[in-house]
Amino acid sequence: METKDIEILIQKFALQNAYKHGSVPQAGAVTGKLLGTHPELRPHAKELMPIVQKVLADIGQMSQDEIKAKLSEIAPELIEELSVKKEVRRGLPPLDTSMLKPGQKVTLRIAPNPNGPPSLGNARGIIVNHEYARMYDGVFIMRFDDTDPSIKKPMIEAYTWYVEHAKWLGCPPDKVVAASDRLPLYYEQAEKLIDLGKAYVCTCDNEVFHDLKEAGKPCPHRETPPAENMEKWKKMLAGGYGGKEAVLRIKTDIAHKDPAMRDWVAFRIVTEPHPKTGTKYMVWPMLDFESAMEDHFLGVTHIIRGKDLMKTADKQKYIYRYLGWEYPHVSHWGRVRLLGFGKFSTSVMKKGIEAGEYRGWDDPQLPTVVALKRRGIEPEAIRNVMINMGVTETDIEFSMDTLYAENRKIVDPKANRYFFVPDPVVLKVNGAPFTTAKAPLHPQDHKRGFREMCVAENPEILIPKSDADNARPGDILRLKDLYNVRITGSDPLTGDYIGNDLSVLKQGAKIVQWVTREGGVPTRVIGPDGEFHGIAECDIRNELNNVVQFERFAFVRIDTINGVVLAYYTHP
């Protein structure tokens, strides 16, 4: 490829980047795009850098309108690529509704255990089930599977959190039910099964029953007459047995090829108080029984559950056959592995909070909905990403970068721009006149207004330590939207004012964000990878609860303003 052709390609990619982001791109971004589309140029990467620097220097002297005009002239298709929203959304496959009776509504449910706030994984279930309900003008139910007061003990606050966060995600439930409020219903159905001879009270030792089950042999209680089983059941309800002395089993096929299917437990005794019902009940249904009951009585027509729960339907269908019920249509989806967060369960997160490892459920290190909300992730972005995943049994590796990219589409047009200087270092500028720097609040929307920053003569400017550490005498820094400085000393850091000519960018001058020593506000940014302390422009105090972009740093959400501004890291 001729040098001239390469330069035109670089110019196209650089102009597109500048037009999209409203600022001169980093050389690496342009080079990466070039080498990604033309891998044959990779052996010549070093030779290309001077061409890239020259093109970027030229673009640095152009206004946004000039950038758009030039891009329209040499590569109008790249303008169109940015302006047309591509529909890459896979969306959700249609549901099978052939089994619905006349007038029957599509009804779906999300069934969380309220032992903590919803995580990003829970959000998938909320969003997909809600979306299907809306697609078919159906019903979306939030049902709390809270019948395990010992191992997965519910949190009272979590009931409210789930409903509130579902509403924030744009997925308000049509009905909210807690299984712990409906134990009399489960007892009634258990007694029907006992009368039918399809359930029995077992008082075998756990190890004894396990050995019998593995051998495909019935326990001595399996053929107990229904009347005697009912007496034992009533004894269970009355507290006549200790914690592990009795269970109610569903009679299935004791010789089933899968031992897990053989006479599984429907109810067990739990003496630990329940956060909602206290000590009112001590005989609690297992999830497979409770869920089977609720799906029937709530009129659930379609269930979406993890493929790791495929056996659940086989277990529950015994009950449905015994009671003459029709089982809902079931779809399964694969696991989602959340890259960048490691393995987080609600119990692990709770232990970490109690140990002081995390600030709370909204700690940015955690993949909870409330943490993402506090960081400035938009509910629309979460919805789009989850719906795009679709419903497939294939396991998915989900990178947070995917969510960040979706969120960036939403916040980038809205977020005002400001300077934030992490780990500030003083740069003494000699020979500089009094100057008023003027920078747009948004590079692509000048109607929004400008930030004006007054800078005294011979000022002390604060710049990031990372830039200060790399500055050497003779280097030229372009203080963004202010002027140019030639470094004269490193310890302390000093420089001479050398005007405002943007042509210094052709010489490789580095663009640096800055704040005056007098015109900034102490700012702390909390992110998933740690904290950043520095100084930001004073005007960010007008952005409470808004997402803004700290130029050359990241998007952040301004959380609190109390002397020091506290911001939460959103994403790059």
From Swiss-Prot:
One of its GO terms (molecular function) is ATP binding. It is found in: Cytoplasm. InterPro entries: Gln/Glu-tRNA_Ligase, Glu-tRNA-synth_arc/euk, Glu/Gln-tRNA-synth, Glu/Gln-tRNA-synth_Ib_cat-dom, Glu/Gln-tRNA-synth_Ib_codon-bd, Rbsml_bL25/Gln-tRNA_synth_N, Ribosomal_bL25/Gln-tRNA_synth, Rossmann-like_a/b/a_fold. Its main location: cytoplasm. GO terms for biological process: amide biosynthetic process; glutamyl-tRNA aminoacylation. One of its GO terms (cellular component) is cytosol. Belongs to the class-I aminoacyl-tRNA synthetase family. Glutamate--tRNA ligase type 2 subfamily. This is Glutamate--tRNA ligase. It comes from Methanocella arvoryzae (strain DSM 22066 / NBRC 105507 / MRE50). The lineage of its organism: Archaea, Methanobacteriati, Methanobacteriota, Stenosarchaea group, Methanomicrobia.
